[in-house]
């Protein structure tokens, strides 16, 4: 981490203030987990890199509530920050992907998913690498759909931040596209996207109309059992589950877009009339949870 002195300083300055982390700062916990990883699982780059990067998002998402410091969404935030660092380290793509998966999922309830070996190993390290006044054995359970056994069509749910490449991918698929952005743009063809979005956001009746149009299109494609692509951010488990519940006969696949944040930022600045605020990105980064097969996905592809 010598290449990132500013990040290390932030980790040293970020205190846990938690009964689950009485060892002190994020940096102290990171060092404890990394030391355990190198001794218990030597020459394991996935666990070593995950140990170094799993909590870097805590430096940016922490807030005080009821006298306690909370880091809600740090797993997702850490995942996106880690992409560029792993690229700087020239980490091979297969190892990079496994690290990103493990970072994103290191806070989920492992008893309810088919967790990978690295994820189970890292959970052990994460729990051992701290000083706790109260033991935390696991985390909140997740809610999944029950996949149908009789599928007639495929729904590809795209997952990623704005400007990560989802819409371009959807357009090249040649399939019907379910997109809230497209509905908003079609309502105001003479407006820029930002103008159209702000117009809709300022009027509850227009927001309701957009939702109605979205539901109508979704219902139509579900009823006709057509292959389609859902082009929205879909960063959270709940947002994906909401879509999946509307297709009774579909097989689901996910396509996850994880380009470096520098690429996303450059694309965001280069799109005339469509600039996504930083606060929106931060919110979506915090909501991000890596899709897993247990959610009901038959396959998951990654575009890094």
Residue ranges and their predicted role:
Residues 1-64:
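Acidic/His-rich, divalent-metal-binding segments that scaffold phosphate/diphosphate chemistry
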Residues 176, 259-304:
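Conserved GTP-binding G-domain of TRAFAC-class P-loop NTPases and closely related GTPase folds
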Residues 204-252, 256:
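Glycine-rich phosphate-binding loop used to anchor ATP phosphates in small-molecule kinases
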Residues 155-173:
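Glycine-rich phosphate-binding P-loop
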Residues 150-156, 225-226:
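Pre-Walker A (Motif I) flank of P-loop NTPase domains
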Residues 20-23, 63-74, 197-209:
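Short, contiguous acidic/charged loop-to-helix segments that flank catalytic cores in large enzymes
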Residues 168-226, 263-266:
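Conserved substrate/cofactor phosphate-moiety recognition/catalytic segment
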